[in-house]
């Protein structure tokens, strides 16, 4: 564990050649994304009028999106609110444009057979960067998958995701070998996965074809919200990587590796987010070009923010923290201004069922425990305390709530603590385990731990 203030004075930034200490930093090659530029000016009023009259204006909106640099800070709750907001209207049309680009569906007559027509719904979300700044308005059209019928609308649904332990091991390996990790995001990833079943969905709210109001869309590829969508996307991406020469991991099916003339490239996937890296930058460029050719991608120069983790890559190692996530947790539970304490739990703390104690809201208690358990991914110092409090989620009492608040007060004291993977450390797999003997006062079970 290490504080952020104790990190090296400069980040290994490929675009910075001078640092404050006066030394010259050698510029290194890195991945960059080249975004297409669209010329021309667009009349917004004409676009809005065209949409209200049911005319197709995808091309005009595409041009307009290229020039519109502002985003809305308010997430609409209803489709009607989004349709009168230019920013969200553009985001909705971008989503439909991606449907057309990926050939996701076809407008057809409503089936007369016993096929199920699944409803659709708009979801609106502001996308933020690692500092919490809104950078994009994202509108997602999803299928109401809860109405799907097993055996009729879907079959296999399971799709693996990367374990957080695997991601941490990848970070440690990259730090040990001194190479930079990069991140890719596949835009509208599920829309790339071919469907095996015959599935129909209703027309999206606010974008109904006025000439064919009774028509529905027949899906050729998966739609967000469908139960089989994650599986369809994973199978499609897996096939692409295997055809490209990658080998899937035996223990972790989301880790793919490829050797090319003695060089190694690693690729870790988490649904539509992809982490990859190699000591050979040209191998990374080749892989990035291959992905961009086959999928619509957004590409970062290096890995900085992933699944709520803030990742800083230095020449001396890699620092992993969840400072932003922690800040959100403290604000959510009203503990931002709480008085700090120096330990996550007082020594010799004993928690019991406390059946005669004052009951506490179970939903809120479980929410607090769930939030803290995810924070443990970069804060092993609170793992024992959180797990002890997690035993009483079925019937929490005020005494248990007080113990959780003590953990939050400790986090107020250590907001920037995280995991540091130094380059000069040994990359050996070492296991530790320990246990007490019947130490639990409630059921006399032993407490064990391992890492």
Predicted regions, residues:
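Conserved beta-strand/loop block within the catalytic cores
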Residues: 90-162, 168, 189-191, 249-270, ...
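Retroelement integrase C-terminal DNA-binding domain
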Residues: 1-97, 159, 328-343, 349
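Mobile genetic element proteins and their domesticated derivatives, centered on retroelements
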Residues: 41, 47-48, 79, 92-95, ...
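Divalent metal-binding acidic/histidine catalytic loops
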Residues: 136, 141, 154-158, 162, ...
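Reverse-transcriptase-like RNA-dependent polymerase core
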Residues: 45-76, 125-152, 161, 187-217, ...
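A common structural junction motif
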Residues: 245, 292-299
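Conserved catalytic palm subdomain of right-hand nucleotidyl-transferase polymerases, strongest
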Residues: 128, 132-137, 141, 174-189, ...
């Amino acid at each position: 564990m290490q504080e952020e203030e104790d990190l090296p004075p400069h980040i290994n930034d490929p675009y910075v050649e001078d640092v404050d200490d006066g030394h010259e930093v050698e510029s290194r090659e890195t991945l960059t994304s080249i975004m297409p530029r669209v010329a021309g000016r667009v009349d917004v009023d004409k676009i809005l009028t065209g949409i209200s009259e049911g005319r197709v204006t995808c091309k005009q909106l595409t041009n307009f999106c290229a020039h519109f640099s502002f985003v809305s800070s308010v997430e609409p709750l209803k489709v009607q609110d989004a349709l009168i907001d230019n920013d969200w209207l553009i985001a909705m049309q971008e989503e439909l444009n991606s449907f057309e680009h990926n050939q996701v569906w076809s407008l057809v007559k409503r089936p007369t057979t016993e096929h199920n027509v699944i409803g659709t719904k708009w979801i609106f979300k502001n996308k933020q960067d690692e500092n919490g700044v809104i950078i994009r308005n994202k509108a997602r059209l999803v299928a109401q998958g809860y109405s799907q019928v097993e055996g009729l609308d879907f079959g296999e649904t399971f799709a693996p995701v990367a374990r957080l332990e695997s991601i941490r091991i990848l970070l440690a390996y990259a730090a040990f070998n001194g190479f930079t990790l990069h991140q890719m995001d596949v835009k509208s990833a599920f829309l790339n996965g071919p469907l095996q079943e015959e599935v129909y969905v209703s027309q999206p709210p606010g974008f109904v074809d006025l000439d064919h109001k009774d028509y529905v869309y027949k899906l050729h590829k998966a739609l967000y919200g469908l139960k089989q969508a994650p599986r369809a996307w994973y199978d499609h991406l897996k096939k692409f990587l295997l055809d490209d020469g990658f080998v899937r991991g035996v223990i972790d099916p989301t880790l793919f590796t490829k050797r090319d003339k003695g060089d190694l490239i690693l690729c870790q996937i988490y649904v539509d987010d992809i982490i990859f890296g190699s000591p050979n930058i040209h191998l990374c460029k080749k892989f990035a070009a291959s992905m961009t050719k086959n999928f619509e991608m957004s590409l970062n120069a290096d890995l900085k923010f992933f699944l709520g983790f803030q990742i800083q890559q230095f020449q001396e190692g890699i620092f992993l923290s969840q400072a932003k996530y922690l800040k959100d947790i403290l604000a959510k539970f009203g503990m931002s201004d709480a008085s700090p304490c120096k330990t996550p739990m007082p020594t010799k703390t004993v928690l019991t069922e406390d059946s005669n104690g004052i009951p506490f809201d179970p939903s809120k208690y479980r929410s607090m425990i769930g939030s803290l358990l995810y924070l443990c991914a970069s804060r092993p110092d609170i793992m024992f305390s959180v797990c002890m409090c997690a035993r009483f989620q079925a019937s929490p009492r005020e005494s248990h709530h007080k113990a959780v608040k003590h953990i939050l007060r400790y986090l107020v004291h250590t907001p920037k603590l995280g995991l540091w993977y130094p380059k000069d450390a040994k990359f050996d797999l070492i296991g530790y385990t320990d246990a007490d003997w019947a130490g639990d006062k409630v059921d006399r079970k032993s407490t064990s731990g391992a890492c």
